[in-house]
């Protein structure tokens, strides 16, 4: 798709919409998700915003340089934000737009990423994970299927043939497999793709900068 110019990520859920947290609440999972002492200063960014940001970095290979965030709490009976809209600048000059929300009624775990470049764009949707849409600036739209012929890289992370869903747990299996291979490998030049503590540090820095930006209502570097 050429030089990357714009990245758009949205990840929406609805579990916190209209929720009321009290001592009699039987849904204990909601308690820790909205407990600042446990989850941190942001409900939406700590839970799903990290996934959105890491996904954009992984797919594009780019790192953010500055951002402007607008954090919002839509539910009256909770103490943490559940909606975040973030404008991003990347190191190569590309722009980004993020929307993550856990109070979007009807939001069915809708994780979607679109990356636009000088020669076209790609789009991937979590609810239809086996397919990647390639939109060339010139020519017809192409739908690339998981494990398609010639996709050596994706085949390394696939355990079933094309047309069959991998399943959620296989994502963890890919991480374990790469870590084990890295430990046992004698090839020091081989590049591995599993996330490390460094990626965790980057996302933690991203979250804190979003919180500071929203509070100060200004662009911040990170």
Residue ranges and their predicted role:
Residues 1-78, 132, 217:
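Predominantly a Rossmann-like dinucleotide-binding segment in NAD(P)-dependent oxidoreductases
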Residues 206-216:
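Short arginine-rich
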Residues 46-67, 72-121, 127-130:
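Glycine-rich, aromatic-lined ligand/substrate-binding cores of catalytic
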Residues 4, 67, 191-196, 220-222:
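Short, hydrophobic secondary-structure boundary micro-motifs
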Residues 52, 175, 179, 203-207:
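Alpha-helical packing segments of well-folded alpha/beta enzyme cores
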Residues 23-29, 33, 85, 90, ...:
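C-terminal glycine/acidic-rich active-site capping loop/insertion
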């Amino acid at each position: 798709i050429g030089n990357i110019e714009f990245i758009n990520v949205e990840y929406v859920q609805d579990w916190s919409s209209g929720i009321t947290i009290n001592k009699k609440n039987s849904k204990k999972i909601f308690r820790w998700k909205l407990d600042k002492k446990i989850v941190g200063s942001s409900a939406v960014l700590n839970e799903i915003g990290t996934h959105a940001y890491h996904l954009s970095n992984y797919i594009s290979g780019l790192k953010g340089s500055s951002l402007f965030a607008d954090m919002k709490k839509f539910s009256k009976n909770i103490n943490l934000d559940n909606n975040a809209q973030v404008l991003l600048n990347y190191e190569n000059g590309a722009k980004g737009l993020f929307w993550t929300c856990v109070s979007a009624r009807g939001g069915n775990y809708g994780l979607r990423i679109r990356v636009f470049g000088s020669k076209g764009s790609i789009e991937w949707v979590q609810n239809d994970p086996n397919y990647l849409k390639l939109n060339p600036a010139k020519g017809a739209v192409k739908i690339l299927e998981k494990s398609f012929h010639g996709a050596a890289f994706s085949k390394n992370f696939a355990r079933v043939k094309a047309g069959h869903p991998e399943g959620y747990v296989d994502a963890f299996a890919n991480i374990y497999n790469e870590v084990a291979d890295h430990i046992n490998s004698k090839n020091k030049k081989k590049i591995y793709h599993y996330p490390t503590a460094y990626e965790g540090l980057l996302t933690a820095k991203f979250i804190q900068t979003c919180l500071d930006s929203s509070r100060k209502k200004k662009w911040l570097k990170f």
